[in-house]
From Swiss-Prot:
Residues 1-183 are annotated as: Large ATPase domain (RuvB-L). The RuvA-RuvB-RuvC complex processes Holliday junction (HJ) DNA during genetic recombination and DNA repair, while the RuvA-RuvB complex plays an important role in the rescue of blocked DNA replication forks via replication fork reversal (RFR). RuvA specifically binds to HJ cruciform DNA, conferring on it an open structure. The RuvB hexamer acts as an ATP-dependent pump, pulling dsDNA into and through the RuvAB complex. RuvB forms 2 homohexamers on either side of HJ DNA bound by 1 or 2 RuvA tetramers; 4 subunits per hexamer contact DNA at a time. This is Holliday junction branch migration complex subunit RuvB. CDD domains: AAA (cd00009). It comes from the Bacteria.
Length: 336
């Protein structure tokens, strides 16, 4: 994995198996997202007491925050099966029909990147979610007719990084909507310590804190950096990952004190040096740094906004004083 992708919140090829090994099974084992956990505990308990399928759930927020993990935990807590797919993988309405008709009562259907469903596929979900049935058109010409297929009550869990791209008819059919937020450093420390046990690796509390501080509020990034720092510690012959080795490794990997990587710094530098700090429109910025608009909006901007490196204005993005300080660049008017 290249250095610029170490802090990407998107799952890299081959990481799914690692994430599966680290995945908690129950809400009591799930670290962070306290507001979401409290809500889901109530909703799950109520559904079980009524012996009903849980209402449909929409999880939205930046990548790497545990939306897929939470979907599996919800299914485990309900004691039902989970079938997992993604928006791009469901190419035709018939693919979705096959998934829906294979569900047992109470099962969970998880659709990642649900905002990327094709419109004809999405429309099949409307009646399935609302009234638990689908109409299938069969035959050709004068023999064309619709078959009404009832479905067992089920729970659809949709995950998206771009909730604003969901159509209103689809969004309105989710009874439970939860916003996954960036993790606090103390929660990331707990995740790193838990992951180190799974990896059979010891790490000092100070090193775990430093790693958590630079992990962009994202468990996926924390676990990825832990694996790389472990490599440096093992080569040095350390039996426990030290703070010194952690700092050295992260410097080598070009992850700075705020968790910014090369692309973050390139984005901020471009705004400052080429556009006087902004405002800058998204299309202009994407073209200048060689990234597509969706990547900037879903991977980079949320963290930069959350941590006060940029602000949004009606005319575009503007860097803050904090960004100048992080990059060691003079503020406007202070240039020599």
């Amino acid at each position: 994995m290249t250095e610029e992708h170490l802090t990407s919140q998107e799952a890299a090829e081959g990481e799914e198996a690692v994430e599966l090994s680290l995945r908690p099974q129950l809400l009591s084992q799930y670290i962070g997202q306290g507001h979401v956990k409290k809500d889901m505990e109530v909703y799950i308990q109520a559904a079980r007491q009524r012996d009903e399928a849980l209402d449909h759930v929409l999880l939205y927020g930046p990548p790497g925050l545990g939306k897929t993990t939470l979907a599996f935990v919800i299914a485990n807590e309900l004691g039902v099966n989970l079938k997992s797919t993604s928006g791009p993988a469901i190419e035709r309405a018939g693919d979705l029909v096959a998934l829906l008709t294979d569900l047992e009562p109470g099962d969970v259907l998880f659709i990642d990147e649900i905002h990327r469903l094709a419109k004809p596929v999405e429309e099949v979900l409307y009646s399935a979610m609302e009234d638990f049935y689908i109409d299938i058109v069969v035959g050709e010409g004068q023999t064309t007719h619709a078959i009404h297929l009832p479905l067992p009550p089920f729970t659809l869990i949709g995950a998206t990084t771009l909730a604003g791209q969901l159509s209103a008819p689809l969004r309105d059919r989710f009874g439970i909507v939860e916003h996954m937020q960036y993790y606090q450093v103390e929660d990331l420390e707990k995740i790193i310590l838990r992951s180190s046990e799974v990896f059979h690796t010891k790490i000092s509390p100070q090193a775990a804190h430093e790693l958590a501080r630079r992990s962009r509020g994202t468990p996926r990034v924390a676990n990825r950096l832990l694996k790389r720092v472990r490599d440096f510690a093992e080569v040095k012959g350390e039996k426990e990952i030290s703070l010194e080795t952690t700092a050295m490794a992260l410097k080598q990997l070009q992850v700075d004190s705020a968790g910014l990587d090369q692309t973050d710094r390139k984005l901020l530098r471009t705004m400052i040096l080429s556009y006087g700090g902004g405002p800058v429109g998204i299309r202009t910025l994407a073209s200048n740094i060689g990234e597509d608009r969706e990547t900037i909006e879903s991977l980079y901007e949320p963290y930069l906004l959350q941590n006060g490196f940029i602000v949004m204005t009606p005319r575009g993005r503007v860097v803050t004083q904090k960004a100048y300080q992080q990059l060691n660049l003079p503020l406007p008017g202070e240039e020599e």
